[in-house]
UniProtKB/Swiss-Prot annotation:
Main localization of the protein described in the UniProt heading: virion
Subcellular location: Virion membrane; Host endoplasmic reticulum membrane; Host Golgi apparatus membrane
Alphabetical keyword list: Glycoprotein, Host endoplasmic reticulum, Host Golgi apparatus, Host membrane, Host-virus interaction, Inhibition of host innate immune response by virus, Late protein, Membrane, Transmembrane, Transmembrane helix, Viral immunoevasion, Virion
Signal peptide: none
Record family assignment: Belongs to the asfivirus minor capsid protein p17 family.
Protein name: Minor capsid protein p17
Assembly description: Interacts with the minor capsid protein M1249L and with the hexon capsid protein p72 capsomers; these interactions form a rigid zipper structure that stabilizes the capsomers. Interacts with host STING1.
Lineage, highest ranks first: Viruses, Varidnaviria, Bamfordvirae, Nucleocytoviricota, Pokkesviricetes
Superkingdom assignment: Viruses
List of glycosylated residues: 12, 61, 97
Amino acid sequence: MDTETSPLLSHNLSTREGIKQSTQGLLAHTIARYPGTTAILLGILILLVIILIIVAIVYYNRSVDCKSSMPKPPPSYYVQQPEPHHHFPVFFRKRKNSTSLQSHIPSDEQLAELAHS
């Protein structure tokens, strides 16, 4: 049984080796004949692969960021809350403080009275 399959295997391997050698010979011949063009084409190919990797990383990061960020509720949601909780971001508390500070700002009429006195 080994004697029947071994010639087929050896023939198959020799065919593969022949194809491999002819391909390597063609590449070597092309590189030797056109070294500048081959270098330019290889450089362009490498740059395209690098750009493709960068674009894939950026696209993946954006899709992860979009999934992780929660949809923000409308601004009226925060107005209806009687007291801002501690887990809210700080700028919502500052907004409430700024509205309370605006009530202490004197109006134009009060400023005119102060200027005349």
